[in-house]
């Protein structure tokens, strides 16, 4: 995995957004 990849930031943003969505769903259920 190359941290200097052109899509590194995009992938990180997608993962972070997905994590936030999962967190919101869990918070709503709890």
Curated annotation (Swiss-Prot):
Coiled coil: none
One Pfam family it belongs to: ATP1G1_PLM_MAT8
Biological process, per Gene Ontology: regulation of monoatomic ion transport
Keyword hit for Ribonucleoprotein: no
Entry comment on modification after translation: Phosphorylated by protein kinase a (PK-A) and protein kinase C (PK-C). Phosphorylated in response to insulin and adrenergic stimulation.
Keyword list, A-Z: Chloride, Chloride channel, Endoplasmic reticulum, Ion channel, Ion transport, Membrane, Microsome, Phosphoprotein, Transmembrane, Transport
PROSITE patterns assigned to the protein according to its UniProt record, in alphabetical order: FXYD
Membrane topology according to the record: Single-pass type I membrane protein
Entry's Gene Ontology cellular component terms: chloride channel complex; endoplasmic reticulum membrane
Subcellular localization(s) per the UniProt record: Microsome membrane; Endoplasmic reticulum membrane
One Gene Ontology molecular-function label: chloride channel activity
Cited function: Induces a hyperpolarization-activated chloride current when expressed in Xenopus oocytes. May have a functional role in muscle contraction.
Family: Belongs to the FXYD family.
Protein name as catalogued: Phospholemman-like protein
Origin species: Squalus acanthias (Spiny dogfish)
Species lineage: Eukaryota, Metazoa, Chordata, Craniata, Vertebrata
